[in-house]
């Protein structure tokens, strides 16, 4: 059989390995850590169970499609609940005025009503905004997300050409400016601009093409996998193993091996060691797929002559934010919070400027995200206690430091965590929050860099600014080494769990020479064994 090695056991690596095995390859996956999942991990302490990363389940059809490609369904592996409210928003100016937070509902009509209440006369314009968001989203799925851009002919379709003037306009205007055309309320503009953070970016530098994200949270709805996101990871791991994938954990890849030193060589396999070094081991392969951070894959695992994306190239790129993550076990209930909660400061220019512009620093006060999953799932915290996951966007800079248990992380990380805890206590009216904390763990940019090998300690990957979107984003095939491919958030189509699943499908299409733009037919039928 044709042998394939996948580097990295995050969602992109697991799904890539699964689809490769389904396609007929003999697949081995190497994961540097003791467990798979990457950013989408799980941590437990004293009866509290935390998702360590992703917590928003959007684009459910992408997950369903992946599982159907594998001959099963998402529903066979985990249960989904629809959230209503989808999320709650605390605005700084509302806190000052004593106004209740805004609950974003699970339907278009309910959210149009909310916008109309906040800004009388906005309903008609917001209806047009959501119509445009949905149309752009459907066009993206059909023509731009499931393609490797290896061939541009399939993109020259009548439906694309018809929308070309609109698409070009959406690329030239920022998301912030585009949203301001539809609503004048600064708080509503924040609701429309915040999805840029999911893209590792700022609404001031993100193309308005991405207003399509508002279709997902304001109309399509927000879901939750019961038990947490590790259930999703476990489901993908199970279908991968059922397809024949061999998973080797605690395997730190030290090099991608080739049959020659220069450009044009072919992969022969990889070399790896255990977590504490030891004697290197070599695995042979006809195809190598790295789902690890692309900067690490290129600059650490390949010599300069074989790097498609050299350090010089990376020096011209923009990293998405890093984050300080805070996992809190809190005694008692916190009904002031919903499942998903956003805390928006009034001065977003300052917030995003501190993250992306020099001199960079941790915003204070910061716009933060807080997840309280036991609003929906009683099994993530003991009894009537509360599980909180807090995300504070910070610059992609490992020098900010690492996290730790019980306040023992780096000073900047713990200071950001303390500020966020105080902010939640004040804005959500939980004055004794700090005294009720019984479990505390933090993660900082240095942890992302060290544990996940991420470029500059980014929590997400390269930002989705224009020059790093669609066909401008790093591709999924090496230009210097034959048989070397990529998947994951660093390459096309981009950041987020759904995009990582799509990247694994684009990989299969690239290997097959399939330049189409549509998702593959379900289920996936094998085309290998063959010469690559």
Please identify what each model-predicted range represents.
Residues 2-141:
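N-terminal glycine-rich phosphate/pyrophosphate-binding loop and immediately adjacent elements
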Residues 94-205:
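Rossmann-like flavin
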Residues 212-279:
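Helical element adjacent to the flavin cofactor pocket in flavoenzyme catalytic cores
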Residues 252-382, 525-528:
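Mid-domain catalytic core of redox enzymes
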Residues 258, 512-532:
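Active-site-proximal substrate-binding core of FAD-dependent oxidoreductases
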């Amino acid at each position: 059989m044709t042998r394939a090695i996948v580097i990295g056991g995050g969602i992109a690596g697991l799904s890539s390995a699964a689809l490769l095995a389904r396609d007929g390859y003999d697949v081995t996956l190497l994961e540097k850590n003791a467990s798979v999942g990457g950013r989408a991990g799980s941590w437990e302490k004293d009866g509290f169970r935390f998702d360590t990363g992703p917590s928003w389940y959007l684009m459910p059809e992408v997950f369903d499609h992946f599982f159907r490609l594998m001959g099963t369904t998402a529903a066979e592996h985990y249960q989904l609940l629809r959230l209503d409210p989808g999320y709650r928003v605390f605005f700084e100016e509302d806190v000052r005025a004593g106004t209740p937070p805004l609950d974003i509902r699970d339907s278009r009509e309910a959210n149009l009503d909310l916008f109309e209440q906040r800004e009388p006369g906005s309903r008609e314009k917001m209806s047009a905004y959501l119509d445009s968001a949905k149309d752009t989203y459907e066009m993206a799925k059909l023509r731009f997300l499931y393609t490797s851009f290896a061939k541009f002919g399939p993109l020259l379709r009548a439906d694309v050409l018809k929308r070309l003037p609109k698409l070009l306009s959406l690329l030239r205007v920022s998301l912030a400016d585009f949203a301001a055309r539809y609503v004048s309320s600064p708080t509503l503009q924040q609701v429309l601009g915040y999805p840029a953070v999911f893209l590792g970016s700022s609404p001031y530098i993100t193309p308005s093409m991405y207003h399509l994200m508002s279709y997902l949270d304001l109309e399509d709805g927000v879901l939750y996998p019961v038990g947490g996101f590790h259930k999703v990871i476990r489901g993908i791991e199970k279908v991968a193993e059922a397809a024949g994938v061999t998973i080797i954990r605690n395997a730190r890849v030290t090099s991608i091996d080739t049959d020659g030193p220069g450009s044009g060589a072919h992969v022969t396999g990889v070399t790896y060691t255990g977590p504490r070094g030891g004697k290197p081991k070599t695995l042979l392969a006809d195809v190598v797929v790295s789902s690890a951070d692309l900067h690490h894959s290129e600059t650490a695992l390949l010599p300069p002559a074989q790097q498609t994306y050299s350090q010089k190239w990376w020096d011209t790129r923009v990293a998405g934010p890093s984050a300080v993550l805070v996992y809190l076990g809190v005694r008692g209930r916190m009904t002031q919070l919903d499942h998903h909660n956003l805390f928006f400061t009034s001065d977003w220019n300052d917030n995003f400027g501190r993250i992306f512009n020099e001199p960079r620093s941790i915003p204070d006060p910061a716009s933060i995200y807080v997840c309280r999953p036991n609003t929906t799932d009683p099994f993530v915290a003991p009894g009537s206690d509360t599980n909180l996951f807090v995300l504070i966007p910070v610059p992609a800079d490992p020098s900010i430091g690492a996290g730790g248990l019980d306040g023992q992380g780096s000073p900047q990380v713990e200071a950001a965590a303390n500020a966020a805890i105080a902010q939640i206590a004040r804005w959500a009216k939980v004055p004794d929050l700090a005294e009720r904390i019984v479990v505390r763990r933090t993660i900082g940019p240095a942890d992302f860099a060290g544990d996940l090998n991420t470029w500059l300690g980014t929590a997400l990957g390269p930002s989705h600014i224009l020059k790093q979107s669609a066909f401008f984003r790093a591709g999924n095939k090496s230009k210097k080494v034959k048989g070397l491919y990529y998947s994951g958030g660093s390459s096309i189509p981009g950041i987020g769990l759904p995009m990582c699943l799509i990247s694994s499908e684009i990989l299969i299409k690239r290997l097959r020479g399939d330049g189409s733009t549509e998702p593959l037919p379900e289920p996936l039928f094998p085309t290998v064994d063959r010469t690559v």
